[in-house]
Amino acid sequence: RVSIYSARRPLLARTHIQGRVYNFLERPTGWKCFVYHFAVFLIVLVCLIFSVLSTIEQYVALATGTLFWMEIVLVVFFGTEYVVRLWSAGCRSKYVGVWGRLRFARKPISIIDLIVVLASMVVLCVGSKGQVFATSAIRGIRFLQILRMLHVDRQGGTWRLLGSVVFIHRQELITTLYIGFLGLIFSSYFVYLAEKDAVNESGQVEFGSYADALWWGVVTVTTIGYGDKVPQTWVGKTIASCFSVFAISFFALPAGILGSGFALKVQQKQRQKHFNRQIPAAASLIQTAWRCYAAENPESSTWNIYVRKPTRSHTLLSPSPKPKKSVMVKKKKFKLDKDNGVSPGEKTLTVPHITCEPVSEKRRPDHFSVDTCDSSVKSPMLLEVSTTHFLRTNSVAEDLDLEGETPLVPITHVSQLREHHRATIKVIRRMQYFVAKKKFQQARKPYDVRDVIEQYSQGHLNLMVRIKELQRRLDQSIGKPSLFISVSEKSKDRGSNTIGARLNRVEDKVAQLDQRLVLITDMLQQLLSLHHGGPPGSRPPSGGGAQVQPCGPTNPELFLPGNALPTYEQLTVPRRGPEEGS
């Protein structure tokens, strides 16, 4: 980054004054602009109130005389303001020169201001009789005062906001107005057909024409209800009541649409403003993160911003007597700032510059001093922090005072940067990164209570979804009947799907398996005894093989088909009956 400095702060030029005046009048920001424009609005409002009072007989004399002097003051004030606005517009390039001023004067609000000023001057010069206005002049003054109310909103923000809301919701507004207009003309026509021959109590026909019916329809569907025209027959009243409910509902919809549109527009502006505050914080975070990454890069371009270009007037060794260290440091700092075009006491945006004390070749390495002084670090927030001067030496301080001080030499090349310089720069960059990260996190926080509530509701909804999913899996694991099972199946298996019932079935199956294993063991023993040719229950010969304990006589029921091993379906389907475990 290359910083360009000026010798001193420039004086206020003509264009600068024009710019400040133009921003004050045309782009009001701040409490001073608010006070000024609000005072102008109050003056115009008071003048309008006096013009209203001039129509009341009790206050004619007081209001007319006061209104005369107020009009003179307002004409002079608005005329002067118009000239100042025309002059200050020259700060912008498109309004420079005569043609630029004419372009500024062709703006609608400028035309209205000019008309008000000229018309007020004409009324004051022609329509006044002494210190009061004529009756015809007062009528013109009232109209001009109404036009002055447009002066309050010179930027047209109100009209732009209304236009944007109408444009966004144009489809809904067109639909409601179209349907409401159809309801109006149909209701008016049917009421006219029913009431065209009806006579009221005074003997007059209220709905003598279709125009009278349309007037009644407009007054009815807009919920004004003057009561000047009322249906007389029951047929007309029935038609009017039916169509009124339908038409009034559609004529009331545009108000709700515009209200919701304004609310959404305000919320959108707040979100955009909150997002705009995040952009500088994000850019600063990206910049500091990149600088931290670049600090690990050995390329010279990373460190060039900390190197000061050499000056011609700078000499390493001065033949003059060396001043004391404190005086020398102050003069050196003033000289370096002056060389860079920075006046004393002026805060500018710079990068840290590093200076060091040159080491003489004759001096031994054991006796050297490194002075990292005058490294003024100025952050982007224009806060100047001057580092202290560290002196490292293993000699006595008195010897240094006797020997004098070596003038500090700014680092003019990347190769002169030492390891402690690079380490310091890395630490500073790391600190700047953490500060930028904290600011970005603060900028990301919700700006409104509604956003906090919305985030809480969204988090609560996600939590409930996860809880329901966990409950579903738990029900599936413990055997709870699903939602798609019919009511009859639920009532049939109400007690068999609990954990206790399932454990009981498992225990029953284990007992059945134990009995089957006992039967299988008996069958194997019987088969083994028959294989050796002995009577059932006799011992086999001891010529080898396993010794089998004798058992009782052969049970013929063991070989029945019913004693076969149970199938998978028999093990899974529970038996119902008192002898299930036998």
From Swiss-Prot:
The gene is KCNQ1. GO terms for biological process: action potential; inner ear development; intestinal absorption; membrane repolarization; membrane repolarization during ventricular cardiac muscle cell action potential; potassium ion export across plasma membrane; regulation of gastric acid secretion; renal absorption. Residues 211-231 dip into the membrane without crossing it. The modification Phosphoserine is found at residues 318, 320. A 1,2-diacyl-sn-glycero-3-phospho-(1D-myo-inositol-4,5-bisphosphate) binds at residue 155. The lineage of its organism: Eukaryota, Metazoa, Chordata, Craniata, Vertebrata. It comes from Felis catus (Cat). The chain crosses the membrane at residues 32-53, 65-87, 104-129, 138-153, 172-194, 234-259. Residues 281-293, 426-440 are annotated as: Interaction with CALM. Residues 1-31, 88-103, 154-171, 260-582 are cytoplasmic. It is found in: Cell membrane; Cytoplasmic vesicle membrane; Early endosome; Membrane raft. Residues 499-527 are annotated as: Interaction with AKAP9. Signal peptide: none annotated. Residues 149-157 are annotated as: Interaction with KCNE3. Each channel subunit contains six transmembrane segments (S1-S6) with S1-S4 forming one voltage sensing domain (VSD) and S5-S6 contributing to form one quarter of an interlocking pore-forming domain (PD). One of its GO terms (cellular component) is cytoplasm. It catalyses: K(+)(in) = K(+)(out). One of its GO terms (molecular function) is phosphatidylinositol-4,5-bisphosphate binding. This is Potassium voltage-gated channel subfamily KQT member 1. Glycans are attached at residue 200. Residues 496-532 form a coiled coil. Residues 530-582 are annotated as: Disordered. It comes from the Eukaryota. Residues 500-531 are annotated as: C-terminal assembly domain (tetramerization). Belongs to the potassium channel family. KQT (TC 1.A.1.15) subfamily. Kv7.1/KCNQ1 sub-subfamily. It is a multi-pass membrane protein. Phosphorylated by PKA; increases delayed rectifier potassium channel activity of the KCNQ1-KCNE1 complex through a macromolecular complex that includes PKA, PP1, and the targeting protein AKAP9. Ubiquitinated by NEDD4L; promotes internalization. The ubiquitinylated form is internalized through a clathrin-mediated endocytosis by interacting with AP2M1 and is recycled back to the cell membrane via RAB4A and RAB11A. Residues 54-64, 130-137, 195-210, 232-233 are extracellular. Pore-forming subunit of the voltage-gated potassium (Kv) channel involved in the regulation of cardiomyocyte excitability and important in normal development and functions of myocardium, inner ear, stomach and colon. Associates with KCNE beta subunits that modulates current kinetics. Induces a voltage-dependent by rapidly activating and slowly deactivating potassium-selective outward current. Also promotes a delayed voltage activated potassium current showing outward rectification characteristic.
